[in-house]
Amino acid sequence: MLKQFVLTVLLLLVVANSVEAQSAYRFKVDVPFQFVLNGQTLPAGKYVIERTDPARPNILTLKTVDRRIVRLVITQRVEKDEPSTASSLIFIQRRGKHYLFQVWTVAAMNGNQIPYALDKKVDEQRRNNVTLVMLRAKQ
């Protein structure tokens, strides 16, 4: 009986640690504007961003809270000098459109960057004329 109790407690600890580790790679953001992701315009709304496989940190899932829209996002690794202070999405704003550009998780020095955040046809001079918009995750 004591052995079963100890095994149950250990199992609960493992599950709790697993859930805590997963939550570091999952967060919600309320996006107040339409945005472009991989050439498709997505509506404003509440989104969940998550890394579904820790072994593949460059593959993210972006979905609306109601799961009506689900997108698999293949990204490139990007780094910064200081850890991220909050989970967030970075958008490039250009000519009235917002393009999902980067995804950062709290306390991480490595983020995810969408390779073709801008139209491929845009020349280099236009690419330099952009504004960055950051949306922080809900606490």
How would you describe each model-predicted region?
Residues 57, 61-85:
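Mature extracytoplasmic domains of secretory-pathway proteins
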Residues 6-16:
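Bacterial N-terminal signal peptides
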Residues 45-49:
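A short tyrosine-centered beta-strand micro-motif
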